[in-house]
């Protein structure tokens, strides 16, 4: 099994009209294309033991225990990994609840799609979900898998604390979400775009783009200026980053 690509979506997209923040993992499941979960000896029982919260996943049945039924009947690795990624985020306090897995035109290659709250956490959990599927499928020690999950959940919580907005910016973004206004985080700090296209507005902490302050700050930061121009399609030197 091999992760071919992990992409991060931050706005309107092909996969969902509602969910804007999505991870798209292109995954080659290799030999597991011929081994659905009902053909992997002991997988169902081991999975239930290490992630009991999967019982809450309704999946296509639309009821509690629905996903477990799918696993027992036989489903493919990409679908299971999608649910692992969602459950691990839930354990870390980031309940997003949206996922899709679709086969591509190439045999054994799937697009595993799931929502995230924090981009860095989303990319981290994609790799963790693949790792745990392989550990369970290969019959690795249950206690070690449980210890690994506990450690990863704590790591995700710490990542979120490191990258989450401060109180002021967070309050503005939360209110924007309540009003149905999409947002994109533009850097690792507090520069945020609210809305899209001609209707977009930008804030930095509690400062709006109605003042010159954001422009002055960006112009005084060479790396931030380079990134902003590069994101707009203006050719810039790569520099040291």
Regions found by a protein language model. Give the residues of each.
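Long, compositionally biased, glycine/small-hydrophobic-enriched stretches that function as flexible linkers
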Residues: 1-152, 159
């Amino acid at each position: 099994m091999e992760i071919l690509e992990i992409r991060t979506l931050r706005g309107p997209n092909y996969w969902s009209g509602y969910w804007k923040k999505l991870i798209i993992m292109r995954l080659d499941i290799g030999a597991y294309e011929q081994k659905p979960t009902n053909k992997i000896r002991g997988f169902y029982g081991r999975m239930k033991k290490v992630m009991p919260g999967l019982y809450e996943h309704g999946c296509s049945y639309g009821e509690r225990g629905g996903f477990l039924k799918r696993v027992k009947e036989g489903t493919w690795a990409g679908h299971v990994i999608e649910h692992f990624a969602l459950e691990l985020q839930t354990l870390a306090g980031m309940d997003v609840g949206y996922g899709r897995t679709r086969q591509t035109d190439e045999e054994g290659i799937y697009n595993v799609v799931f929502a995230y709250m924090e981009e860095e956490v989303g990319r981290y959990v994609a790799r963790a979900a693949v790792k745990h599927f392989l550990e369970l499928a290969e019959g690795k020690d249950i206690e070690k898998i449980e210890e690994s999950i506990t450690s990863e959940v704590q790591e995700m919580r710490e990542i979120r604390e490191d990258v989450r907005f401060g109180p002021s910016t967070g309050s503005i973004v939360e209110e924007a979400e309540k009003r149905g206004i999409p947002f994109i985080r533009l850097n690792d700090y507090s520069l945020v775009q609210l809305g899209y296209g001609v209707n977009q507005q930008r804030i930095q902490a509690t400062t709006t783009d109605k003042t010159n302050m954001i422009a002055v700050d960006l112009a005084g930061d060479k790396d931030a200026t380079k990134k902003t121009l590069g994101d707009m399609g203006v050719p810039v030197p790569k520099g040291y980053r």
